[in-house]
């Protein structure tokens, strides 16, 4: 699976989801939410996955919440 805002890997029963937007402290936007849902659904249906690890890229923040720029441009109505 290829994602724009996430890095998603599965190895030895561990699914790793990394929010990969460190330039905005991993703030989520509509794309991020849709991709997160897809990755979690994939991990859920994979019988080999026993654990899901979610983290943010970079060393400054896990996730600061919603992306203010997207909210200003019309919000999360997509």
Question: Residue ranges of each PLM-predicted region?
Answer:
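Conserved CoA-thioester-binding segment of acyl-CoA-metabolizing enzymes
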Residues: 1-57, 74
């Amino acid at each position: 699976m290829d994602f724009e805002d996430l890095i998603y890997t599965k190895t030895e029963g561990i699914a790793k989801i990394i929010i990969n937007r460190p330039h905005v402290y991993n703030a989520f936007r509509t794309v991020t939410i849709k991709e997160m849902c897809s990755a979690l659904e994939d991990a859920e249906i994979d019988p080999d996955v026993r654990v899901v690890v979610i983290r943010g890229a970079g060393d400054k923040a896990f996730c600061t919440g919603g992306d203010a720029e997207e909210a200003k441009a019309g919000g999360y109505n997509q």
